[in-house]
From Swiss-Prot:
It is found in: Bacterial microcompartment. This is Propanediol dehydratase medium subunit. Part of the PduCDE complex that catalyzes the dehydration of 1,2-propanediol (1,2-PD) to propionaldehyde. This subunit is directly targeted to the bacterial microcompartment (BMC). Expression of a cosmid containing the full 21-gene pdu operon in E.coli allows E.coli to grow on 1,2-propanediol (1,2-PD) with the appearance of BMCs in its cytoplasm. Residues 1-18 are annotated as: Targets protein to the BMC. It catalyses: propane-1,2-diol = propanal + H2O. Pathway: Polyol metabolism; 1,2-propanediol degradation. The propanediol dehydratase enzyme is a heterotrimeric complex composed of a large (PduC), a medium (PduD) and a small (PduE) subunit. The keyword S-adenosyl-L-methionine does not apply. It comes from Citrobacter freundii.
């Protein structure tokens, strides 16, 4: 598919204009990364509170929702502006509708949704986790699978609706009950990738600023 260079340039300029905030310049130095979550906490939405290091789950009737390091902190909406609070509300509701408990943790070692999800499934009592990047990309993962394998992947974040997030929660809960649900239906738009590619890259870079090498996941109290 040929992409008009002028259109692409305009998209990138629009994205950069949108993304101009009071953030400091991107730096991947360890000293900056280590202090970033604390600095961002003052800016973040108060609906998520860290309450200590996440522990290994003992209950098989739970699904862990593992969010990226900037989720609810420096970033509070996904790539198309859906608030993180609303996304979590729907995912949790979907899980609970299936009679399963939801537990939310924040992961710091990676901004890659696959590795965030793997940290979650290792702590999940059922072995099932949902990984969510700040930009909205989501995956359902199972303990024992390699990071780049998964039960269901939702890579086109711009096309994920709140109803889709709710269905993701329901399916994750069904996997926790050892059922074999039909995959969550999703929209497909070939233009979504070129339209949002620049913004997606910028959001990923911004989230990567909050990676803290070696920091263990933190349990989150969620106020919805």
């Amino acid at each position: 598919m040929e992409i008009n260079e002028k259109l692409l340039r305009q998209i990138i300029e629009d994205v950069l204009s949108e993304m101009q905030t009071s953030d400091k310049p991107v730096s991947f130095r360890a000293s900056t990364a280590a202090s970033a979550p604390q600095a961002a906490a003052a800016q973040g939405d108060s609906f998520l509170t860290e309450i200590g290091e996440a522990k290994q789950g003992q209950q098989q009737d739970e699904v862990i929702i593992a969010v990226g390091p900037a989720f609810g902190l420096s970033q509070t909406v996904n790539i198309v502006g859906i608030p993180h609070k609303n996304i979590l509300r729907e995912v949790i509701a979907g899980i609970e509708e299936e009679g399963i408990k939801a537990r939310v943790i924040r992961c710091f070692k990676s901004s890659d949704v696959a590795f965030v999800a793997v940290e979650g499934n290792r702590l999940s009592g059922s072995g099932i986790s949902i990984g969510i990047q700040s930009k909205g990309t989501t995956v359902i993962h199972q303990q024992g699978l390699p990071p780049l394998s998964n039960l269901e992947l939702f890579p086109q974040a711009p096309l994920l609706t709140l109803e889709t997030y709710r269905q993701i929660g329901k399916n994750a809960a069904r996997y926790a009950k050892r059922e074999s649900p039909q995959p969550v239906p999703t929209l497909n738009d070939q233009m979504a990738r070129p339209k949002y590619q620049a913004k997606s890259a910028i959001l990923h870079i911004k989230e990567t600023k909050y990676v803290v090498t070696g920091k263990n996941p933190q349990e989150l109290r969620v106020a919805l």
